């Protein structure tokens, strides 16, 4: 079973980071990769069963959501090659936040696993997750440096 794992430390308290990313239907914090995020069907961005269509290609379903654990899990039901439903199956992604208590920052981990013999999907999803995490860190870096006076 192929797996990808990516993480980053975001220079902001966990409450601020979670508040920014907790809505399954809001990817405005990731402008370098996500150009559109469409709510598909019924359900809000905080409800298990919510569906989204990213960039007209990635169809995801929210399968677990915890405000307490600051975690969401989703299935990828469709995507572009090399992660299309014809190339991989049983894809589960997880986004999880943890506080870094020594300096009031946030550890963000994003991982996924699926079934497939397709080895191209691993590098593809690593690039996707790295880009998303970089956008998230950059947003808070810009906010902090816009406010700080040194």
Regions found by a protein language model. Give the residues of each.
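Residues at beta-strand starts and edge strands
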Residues: 2-4, 56, 70, 89-91, ...
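Short strand-connecting beta-turns/loops that link adjacent beta-strands
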Residues: 13, 67-68, 100-103
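Hydrophobic ligand-binding cavity/cleft-lining segments
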Residues: 1-43
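Hydrophobic/aromatic beta-strand elements that line small-molecule binding cavities or substrate pockets
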Residues: 6-8, 59-64, 90-100
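Glycine-rich portal/gate segments that line the openings of hydrophobic small-molecule binding cavities
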Residues: 25, 29, 38-86, 131
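Short, highly charged C-terminal tails/helix-capping segments
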Residues: 34-39, 138-150
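Beta-strand/loop substructures that line and gate deep hydrophobic ligand-binding cavities in soluble
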Residues: 79-138, 147-149
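Hydrophobic pocket/interface hotspot
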Residues: 17-21, 27, 62, 74, ...
């Amino acid at each position: 079973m192929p797996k990808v794992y990516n993480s980053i430390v975001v220079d902001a308290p966990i409450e601020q980071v979670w508040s920014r990313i907790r809505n399954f239907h809001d990817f405005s914090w990731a402008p370098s990769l996500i150009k559109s995020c469409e709510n598909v069907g019924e359900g809000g961005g905080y409800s298990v069963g919510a569906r989204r269509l990213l960039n007209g290609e990635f169809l995801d379903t929210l399968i677990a959501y915890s405000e307490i654990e600051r975690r969401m899990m989703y299935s990828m039901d469709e995507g572009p090659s090399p992660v299309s439903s014809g190339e991989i199956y049983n894809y589960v992604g997880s986004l999880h936040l943890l506080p870094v208590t020594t300096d009031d920052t946030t550890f963000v981990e994003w991982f996924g696993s699926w079934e497939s013999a397709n080895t191209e999907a691993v590098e593809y999803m690593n690039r996707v997750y790295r880009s998303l995490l970089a956008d998230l860190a950059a947003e808070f870096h810009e906010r902090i440096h816009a406010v700080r006076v040194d």
